[in-house]
Structures are given as structure tokens and as C-alpha cells.
């Protein structure tokens, strides 16, 4: 369409061509501007230094006004070479690396890696019952702490600072339990091939039951603050929409997939660590949006409390039971008393290892320095992390170190949905969509 047809008149000036219009011409002008796609578009970087991108995530947004026309994710700012480093450590030492990937759910990182090793060693059925129950207990505590961070940070990004405050208040209680049981608040390296590092300390079950009772009183606060808040609901409902077909096409899992109403949870569909013996329900929603993902995380914390109660009751009947496989060629002597430094350097430990048998000392030295050998082969074992399917593909060439260890991190896979969720929406809703995915960049970049 010619310019003179669009506008009522024009004239050439020293500043270029100037158009003049009358009050009746605005519809024609709007049509002309809509055809000129480059007119109003700008490209902005959101992140990697941004308080609302859940770490060092860079989003390249192309905007037209406040509408997002294209969204791309830039990753890699937190790459630490974890998978490559694991090839230069023993199978047991690898746990100390993988626990640092998704730093909000370290027990799940350890669990998927250890399950892969145990499958290659063919010792899955020989892991002590108490060790399996402790693994389930720790993972469900970890699920609660991770969901609390997701809800707290998501609320903070929307301006609901009270949600952030109480979310981190409860998470601190979980970290205190982790410190009591493992000695560390994060990066535990507690789940080992063949079992766990050590037994539960005295009084731990009482502390866990006290936490469960307290959380049952605290969780309704989140419903009062969020579900009953029309502003909070208005910012989440209909935002970041992605239906079941889109989730399956992109390989999305976790709350993002279950928000479409599809009850896919590996604890039910492909049980591990005895999850098939626990009574709990898979939480779903049917809105396929950010609000549904929030409600799923809130409901899953209730289910985790149910599992924790069952695990605590089982542990009460397993007092004194072993927590490490009896095979001395695989498991470190976890039944010995642990010193105050957490390194196993108690007097009983030293006396048994160094003072009773030269063969025992040699064997222990080789086990610690060289490690055990894993038969050649490969295995992929997934677990249901707070963010979705977290899997480890471990490959052995018959040596004492992994030939290859690769992880399928749900944050990496789910981050593909950024473009689909954000494009066509407002720039303010990009943050809501990202928060509903709940990515952890340590797991994305590794």
C-alpha cells in the first residue's frame, strides 16, 4: 500500500519526509505500522545477573511493546565439568561430585548415580532394608525443602514477600535435620554404593516426627496466603500454559507434566528403593498452567509427609540393623563408631583397622585409595526428583572409575519450554513461567 494512501499528506523537510494526519486516519496508520514488523521491536537480555532467573540463566527476549515475540534461553554460565571430573575419581568418590549438580536436591543426584552403580554390580537386592528406608526418608525430606524453595522464590518474584519468608523458615528446619543426620546442610555425599554412610544418630526419629507435626500445622498457611489470595491466583492462572501434547513432544516431566492431568510419577510407574510399599497418591492438576504447578508442589509436600511418617515407623523397628552391604569388597566399615570429625577416625575404628589384622589394613587401604571394580556394562536408572525425571547413565569398562557418567537433568529438559510458555505473553509473565518450571542452573549446566 502506498504511503499517500495511508496518510492524508506528506512533505519533504530538512529532517526527512514528514507525514500529516487527521483524526479519521488512525485505523489506517495502525494497519500500516502492523505491517512494518521492525518498527517497535527491541531485544533485551534478562539475566544472567538477574534476581528472578533462578541462578545464572540468560534469557534473550524480543519484545514488541510489552509483548514477547521470541524468547531464547542462554545457558552454560555455571558449567563446572562435573561429568568429566567423575571419570577421574573412584565410583564412591563420584558421589561427592554429583551431589553438587542440582544443589537444591542433592540426595536425588546421589540416588540416581548410586542406583546405576548397584545395577551394574548386581547388588540391588542385597542393599540392607534400613538403608533403603533411610534413602526414602531423606529423599522425601529433600523434596519438601526443594518445593519450599520453589514456592518461596516464586512468591518473592511476584512481590509476595511473606511467602518467601515463611518458605525459607520451614526449609531451615529441614536443613537442620539434614545436618543432624549427615553432618552437612547440603552436598552430603551420604548415599553410597551398597547403602548409606552411617546410621541414624540418637534422637533423630523424634526430631523428624516433631518436624512432621509442625509442618502439618504450617502448610495450611500457604493455602491461606496463596490459594485464597485473588491477586496471587490472578498472576498465575492461565500463565505459562502448555498442554499434554506439548509436554510429551518436549520430553517434560515432573510438576510441569502432571499439571496437564497426566499422573506420571516414577515412584509409581517405575518404583525404586521400595516405593511400591509406601501408601501415597500422585498429585495432578488439570489447568496446564503456572497455578496448577504451584498447587501440585503444595499437595506433594503433604504426600511427602505421609511417606516420611511411614518411613519413620519402619526405622523404629530396625534399630541396630545394618545400613551398608555386608560385602567388604564394596562397602566401607560403616558399622564402626564414627568420630566427632565425621571422618570415621574414632578410636574403635582405628584400633579395628590398624591393630587387629594386617590383611584388613591392606584391604581397607586398597578399598579407600583404589576403590572397587565394577563389571563392564552400562545402566540408566531414573528417579523422580522434585523437578521431574532425573536419570544417570553410567558406563563401566571394568575398572575402578566410571568410563562415562551422564545425567539427564529435568531442569535442562524442562527449560526447553521457556519459549513456548513465554512467547505471545507479557514480559512480566516470563518470570512467572520460569518460576513454574523451577529450574536449578547447577543441574542444567553441570
Curated annotation (Swiss-Prot):
Q: Which UniProt keywords apply?
A: Cell membrane, Membrane, NAD, Quinone, Translocase, Transport
User: Assembly state and interactors?
Assistant: NDH-1 is composed of 14 different subunits. Subunits NuoB, C, D, E, F, and G constitute the peripheral sector of the complex.
Q: Which PROSITE patterns match?
A: COMPLEX1_49K
Under catalytic activity, the entry for this protein gives:
a quinone + NADH + 5 H(+)(in) = a quinol + NAD(+) + 4 H(+)(out)
EC number(s) from the headed UniProt entry = 7.1.1.-
What superkingdom does the record give? Bacteria
Q: Decide whether keyword ATP-binding is in the record.
A: no
Signal peptide positions are none
Name the PANTHER family on file: NADH DEHYDROGENASE [UBIQUINONE] IRON-SULFUR PROTEIN 2, MITOCHONDRIAL (PTHR11993:SF10), NADH-UBIQUINONE OXIDOREDUCTASE 49 KDA SUBUNIT (PTHR11993)
Q: Does the keyword NAD apply?
A: yes
Q: Which GO terms describe its cellular component?
A: plasma membrane
Where's it found, cell-wise? Cell membrane
- Family matches, as HAMAP family: NDH1_NuoD
What species does this protein belong to? Answer: Nocardioides sp. (strain ATCC BAA-499 / JS614)
Q: What is this protein called?
A: NADH-quinone oxidoreductase subunit D
Top EC class for this record: translocase
The way this protein sits in the membrane is described as:
Peripheral membrane protein
Its biological purpose: NDH-1 shuttles electrons from NADH, via FMN and iron-sulfur (Fe-S) centers, to quinones in the respiratory chain. The immediate electron acceptor for the enzyme in this species is believed to be a menaquinone. Couples the redox reaction to proton translocation (for every two electrons transferred, four hydrogen ions are translocated across the cytoplasmic membrane), and thus conserves the redox energy in a proton gradient.
Instruction: Give the similarity note.
Output: Belongs to the complex I 49 kDa subunit family.
The gene designation is: nuoD
GO MF, one annotated term: NAD binding
- Predominant place of localization: membrane
Amino acid at each position: 500500500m502506498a504511503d499517500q494512501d495511508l496518510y492524508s499528506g506528506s512533505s519533504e523537510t530538512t529532517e526527512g519526509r514528514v507525514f500529516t494526519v487527521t483524526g479519521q486516519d488512525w485505523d489506517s496508520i495502525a494497519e500500516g505500522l502492523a505491517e512494518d514488523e521492525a518498527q517497535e521491536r527491541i531485544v533485551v537480555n534478562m539475566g544472567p545477573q538477574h534476581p528472578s532467573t533462578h541462578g545464572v540463566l540468560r534469557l534473550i527476549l524480543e519484545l514488541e511493546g510489552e509483548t514477547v515475540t521470541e524468547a531464547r534461553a542462554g545457558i552454560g554460565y555455571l558449567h563446572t565439568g562435573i561429568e568429566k571430573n567423575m571419570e577421574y575419581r573412584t565410583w564412591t568418590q563420584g558421589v561427592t561430585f554429583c551431589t553438587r549438580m542440582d544443589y537444591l536436591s542433592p540426595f536425588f543426584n546421589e540416588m540416581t548415580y548410586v542406583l546405576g552403580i548397584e545395577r551394574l554390580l548386581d547388588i540391588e537386592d542385597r542393599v540392607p532394608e534400613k538403608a533403603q528406608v533411610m534413602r526414602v526418608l531423606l529423599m522425601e525430606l529433600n523434596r519438601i525443602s526443594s518445593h519450599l524453595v520453589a514456592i518461596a522464590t516464586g512468591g518473592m518474584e511476584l512481590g509476595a514477600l511473606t511467602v518467601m519468608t515463611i518458605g525459607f523458615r520451614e526449609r531451615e528446619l529441614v536443613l537442620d535435620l539434614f545436618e543432624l543426620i549427615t553432618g552437612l546442610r547440603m552436598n552430603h555425599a551420604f548415599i553410597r554404593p551398597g547403602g548409606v554412610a552411617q546410621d541414624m544418630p540418637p534422637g533423630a526419629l523424634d526430631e523428624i516426627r516433631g518436624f512432621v507435626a509442625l509442618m502439618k500445622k504450617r502448610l495450611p498457611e500457604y493455602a491461606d496466603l496463596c490459594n485464597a489470595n485473588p491477586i496471587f491466583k490472578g498472576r498465575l492462572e492461565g500463565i505459562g500454559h502448555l498442554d499434554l501434547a506439548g509436554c510429551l513432544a518436549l520430553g517434560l516431566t515432573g510438576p510441569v507434566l502432571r499439571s496437564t492431568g497426566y499422573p506420571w510419577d516414577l515412584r509409581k510407574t517405575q518404583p525404586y528403593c521400595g516405593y511400591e510399599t509406601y501408601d501415597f497418591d500422585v498429585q495432578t492438576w488439570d489447568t496446564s498452567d503456572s497455578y496448577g504447578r504451584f498447587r501440585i508442589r503444595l499437595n506433594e509436600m503433604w504426600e511427602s509427609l505421609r511417606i516420611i511418617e511411614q518411613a519413620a515407623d519402619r526405622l523404629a523397628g530396625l534399630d541396630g540393623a545394618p545400613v551398608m552391604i555386608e560385602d567388604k569388597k564394596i562397602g566401607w566399615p560403616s558399622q564402626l563408631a564414627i568420630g566427632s570429625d565425621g571422618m570415621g577416625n574414632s578410636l574403635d575404628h582405628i584400633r579395628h583397622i590398624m591393630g587387629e589384622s594386617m590383611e584388613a589394613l591392606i584391604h581397607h587401604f586398597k578399598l579407600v585409595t583404589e576403590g572397587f571394580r565394577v563389571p563392564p556394562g552400562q545402566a540408566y536408572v531414573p528417579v523422580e526428583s522434585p523437578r521431574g525425571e532425573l536419570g544417570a547413565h553410567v558406563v563401566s569398562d571394568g575398572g575402578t572409575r566410571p568410563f562415562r557418567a551422564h545425567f539427564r537433568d529435568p531442569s535442562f529438559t524442562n527449560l526447553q519450554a521457556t519459549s513456548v510458555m513465554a512467547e505471545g505473553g507479557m514480559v512480566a509473565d516470563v518470570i512467572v513461567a520460569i518460576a513454574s518450571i523451577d529450574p536449578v542452573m547447577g543441574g542444567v549446566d553441570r
